[in-house]
From Swiss-Prot:
<keyword id="KW-0369">Histidine metabolism</keyword>
<keyword id="KW-0479">Metal-binding</keyword>
<comment type="pathway">
    <text>Amino-acid degradation; L-histidine degradation into L-glutamate; N-formimidoyl-L-glutamate from L-histidine: step 3/3.</text>
</comment>
<comment type="function">
    <text>Catalyzes the hydrolytic cleavage of the carbon-nitrogen bond in imidazolone-5-propanoate to yield N-formimidoyl-L-glutamate. It is the third step in the universal histidine degradation pathway.</text>
</comment>
<dbReference type="InterPro" id="IPR005920">
    <property type="entry name" value="HutI"/>
</dbReference>
<feature type="binding site">
    <location>
        <position position="313"/>
    </location>
    <ligand>
        <name>Zn(2+)</name>
    </ligand>
</feature>
<feature type="binding site">
    <location>
        <position position="70"/>
    </location>
    <ligand>
        <name>Zn(2+)</name>
    </ligand>
</feature>
<protein>
    <recommendedName>
        <fullName>Imidazolonepropionase</fullName>
        <ecNumber>3.5.2.7</ecNumber>
    </recommendedName>
</protein>
<feature type="binding site">
    <location>
        <position position="238"/>
    </location>
    <ligand>
        <name>Zn(2+)</name>
    </ligand>
</feature>
<dbReference type="Pfam" id="PF07969">
    <property type="entry name" value="Amidohydro_3"/>
</dbReference>
<dbReference type="InterPro" id="IPR013108">
    <property type="entry name" value="Amidohydro_3"/>
</dbReference>
<dbReference type="GO" id="GO:0008270">
    <property type="term" value="F:zinc ion binding"/>
</dbReference>
<feature type="binding site">
    <location>
        <position position="317"/>
    </location>
    <ligand>
        <name>N-formimidoyl-L-glutamate</name>
    </ligand>
</feature>
<dbReference type="InterPro" id="IPR032466">
    <property type="entry name" value="Metal_Hydrolase"/>
</dbReference>
<feature type="binding site">
    <location>
        <position position="72"/>
    </location>
    <ligand>
        <name>Zn(2+)</name>
    </ligand>
</feature>
<feature type="binding site">
    <location>
        <position position="142"/>
    </location>
    <ligand>
        <name>4-imidazolone-5-propanoate</name>
    </ligand>
</feature>
<feature type="binding site">
    <location>
        <position position="315"/>
    </location>
    <ligand>
        <name>N-formimidoyl-L-glutamate</name>
    </ligand>
</feature>
Length: 401
């Protein structure tokens, strides 16, 4: 069998085991042809391969490239000053009353042109790529006007053109009510003006909504879902982060790819997600940064068979995090997730949360050849250590990056 590239003398985490584990192969080989894996498994069982190029991995570990399935990467401005104010005793209400909070990010993002937004976002993207990310989702949501939401999504597309990475764009116009606006009037605008325009331009694959008492109601979220489906877009939701608004249950009824945050998720929501195959995207960075105490119902989600994905939730207000490795450690420490769950959460299950499980997140024939090659002794090192980046190489579609 001819192939373009062969990686050998490697230990593999295929994430393709029947038991849902890491699918470890001790002496493994990965072969790639035209950007797709043609073989991944034990070297002893490999077909006769005739590669154009070979890489001796010297017993390093190979996993699927990491996938960050929930980010707000494209924004302008800096809210470190608010962090400092909170440490000195200011409340979120105090900061918001002084013009801070999400309004500050909206103001800065609206004021920035494409070039400024791109310059601000590239370092955040580069930090993620430096830890093995090959695919990430990027949400809009800091424009809150049609032109500014389009600007964010346009910059997300530009990032993918400038770096070797796959970007999955999500429209999050229903992130917050614009300053001085009315929630229902703005929801109507999202549904009748923004979603049709963004769908027509092919700028987003999915629509997200923040369903919470301080954002959009259950009924308004459903209105957004109906509009999204009418325009052929996938559905996602920020749900049950601060209270139980039954948003995850609603999203599951509409076949949502994922429900994210879900600290206050109840049993009815879990059952609905399990029945619909909706992925639970857990965001330990936001939990940590906001000093939350309501842990997502991990054991109940496990018992129901709901897939568990992880993401950084990179954003300026509640999770200024660009490290998937640190997010894994947070998930293990704060949520008591296992090593296998943490690694699967940034590979196999993250691919599922983005509707890409047919080609990303596992090492098996037919999948895209997106790899992360690690200088580690065991998979647990990726989760156990903090402030440690053992990435040896990143591969996208069979090409070293």
């Amino acid at each position: 069998m001819h192939c373009d590239v062969l990686w050998h003398n490697a230990q593999l985490m295929t994430l393709d085991a029947a038991d849902g584990g890491l699918g470890i192969v001790d002496d493994g080989t990965v072969a790639c042809q035209q950007g797709r894996i043609v073989y991944a498994g034990p070297a002893a069982q490999a077909p006769a391969l005739q590669p154009h190029a070979t890489h001796d991995c010297q017993r390093r570990w190979i996993s699927p490239g990491l996938i960050d399935c929930h980010t707000h990467l494209v924004y302008a401005g800096n809210r470190a000053n608010e962090f400092e104010q909170r440490l000195r005793g200011a409340s979120y209400a105090d900061i918001a009353a002084a013009g801070g909070g999400i309004v500050a990010t909206v103001r800065a993002t609206r004021a920035a042109d494409d070039a400024a937004l791109l310059a601000a976002s590239l370092p955040r993207l580069d930090a993620m790529l430096g830890e093995g990310v090959t695919t990430l989702e990027i949400k809009s949501g800091y424009g809150l006007t049609l032109d500014d939401e389009i600007k964010q999504l346009r910059v997300a597309r530009q990032l993918a053109a400038l770096r070797k990475v796959e970007v999955v764009p999500t429209f999050l116009g229903a992130h917050a009510v614009p300053p001085g606006g009315d929630a229902q009037r703005y929801t109507d605008q999202v549904c009748t003006q923004m979603i049709p325009a963004i769908a027509a331009q092919g700028l987003a694959e999915a629509v997200d909504v923040f369903c919470e008492h301080l954002a959009f109601s259950h009924a308004q979220a459903e209105q957004v879902f109906i509009a999204a489906q009418a325009h052929g877009l996938h559905i996602k939701i920020h749900a049950e982060q601060l209270s139980n608004q039954h948003g995850a249950e609603l999203a599951a009824r509409y076949g949502a790819l994922s429900a994210d945050h879900i600290e206050y998720l109840d049993q009815a929501g879990i059952a609905a997600m399990a029945g619909a195959g909706t992925v639970a995207v857990l965001l330990p960075g936001a939990f940590y940064f906001t000093r939350d105490t309501q842990v997502p119902p991990i054991a109940a989600l496990r018992a129901a068979g709901v897939p568990l994905a992880l993401a950084t939730d990179c954003n300026p207000g509640t999770s200024p995090l660009t490290s998937p490795l640190l997010a894994m450690n947070m998930a293990a420490t704060l949520f008591r997730m296992t090593v296998d769950e943490c690694i699967a959460g940034f590979t196999r299950e993250a691919a599922r949360a983005l509707g890409r499980s047919e080609r990303l997140g596992r090492l098996r024939a037919g999948m895209d050849c997106d790899l992360a090659i690690w200088d580690i002794d065991a998979p647990a090192d990726l989760v156990y250590r903090m402030g440690f980046n053992p990435l040896h190489a990143r591969v996208l579609r069979g090409h070293l990056c």
